């Protein structure tokens, strides 16, 4: 059945011609904990959303995407790996593969997560976008250890009086300052 709906928050060109922006993140509960969901551009260009999900307790992040080769070689895998490392979260990413009328898509569906080698991302299934095997039309599964998704920066740090390394109050002030600029008001 339906567990909810997510509307993509950020729309790259040409999507505003046929879609409207969403305004809310989407987290759903599972027996293994909360899971966050985002779509394509939300993930690759707006890291705040993944960080929000990790801070809310998500150890798994789902990225539905249609990343084409015209977006360059660095955007996809580099962003996913960095998000996995900096937020200490698993990412399940499903990308289109092959060609449509206008685009050639990388493929690169994968399950990426924290490694036992700290500050490294590991591909538990699938391949980076630019790997020649990424174009495979295939469904991937993997057994993952959610204990590796420590999200330590979102937990109390005894070395700084129990506060967290992540400091949303500071970012709130920074964003409130940005909102004074009319170009950022909706």
Give residue ranges: language-model regions.
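Short beta-strand segments enriched in hydrophobic/aromatic residues
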Residues: 30, 41, 95-98, 146
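Active-site catalytic loop in hydrolytic enzyme cores
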Residues: 1-59, 65, 69-79, 158
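Short Gly/Pro-enriched turn/cap motifs at secondary-structure boundaries
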Residues: 17, 100-101, 161, 165
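A short C-terminal boundary segment appended to hydrolase-like catalytic domains
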Residues: 141-186
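Pocket-edge structural micro-motifs
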Residues: 39, 113, 143
């Amino acid at each position: 059945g339906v567990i909810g709906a997510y509307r993509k928050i950020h729309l790259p060109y040409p999507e505003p011609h046929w879609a409207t922006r969403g305004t809310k993140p989407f987290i759903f509960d599972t027996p293994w904990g909360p899971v966050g969901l985002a779509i394509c551009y939300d993930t690759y260009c707006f890291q705040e959303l993944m960080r929000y999900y990790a801070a809310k307790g998500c150890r798994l992040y789902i990225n539905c995407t249609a990343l084409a080769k015209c977006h360059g070689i660095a955007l996809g895998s580099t962003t996913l790996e960095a998000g996995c490392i900096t937020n200490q979260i698993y990412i399940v990413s499903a990308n289109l593969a092959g060609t449509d009328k206008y685009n050639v898509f990388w493929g690169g569906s994968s399950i990426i997560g924290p490694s036992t080698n700290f500050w490294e991302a590991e591909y538990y299934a699938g391949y980076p976008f630019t790997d020649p095997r990424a174009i495979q039309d295939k469904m991937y599964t993997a057994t993952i250890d959610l204990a590796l998704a420590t999200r330590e920066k979102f937990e109390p740090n005894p070395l700084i009086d129990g506060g967290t390394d992540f400091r949303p109050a500071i970012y709130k002030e920074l964003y409130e300052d940005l909102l004074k600029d009319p170009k950022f008001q909706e």
